[in-house]
Amino acid sequence: RIIECLKKTGMSLKDIREYIELAMQGDATIAQRLEMFRKQKAVLEARMAELQQTMDTLDYKCWFYETAAARGSTEGISDLPDEALPEALRPVRERLRAAAEAETEEV
């Protein structure tokens, strides 16, 4: 079961093999195994944060196109005041705008 769990976290087969070898060595490797789990937990937390940001973007785009469908056009939606957006989507729109500005500055 733990091997399946480690696979799902994205741990490499090389690292999973290392974990198995350490586990077979017994209690002398507890600290090393703990460190492996801590590192993999940090990797997974970073992936989850990235996925949450992606989900937030999709939520914003769903709202955007639902609003466009109700209005019959996408025109002007980007110019709506923050108060017109659901509160949870306001920081998402701000992040997307900042990213778009950064991209245009790089060009």
Can you describe what each PLM-predicted range is?
Residues 1-107:
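Arg/Lys-rich, alpha-helical DNA-contact motif
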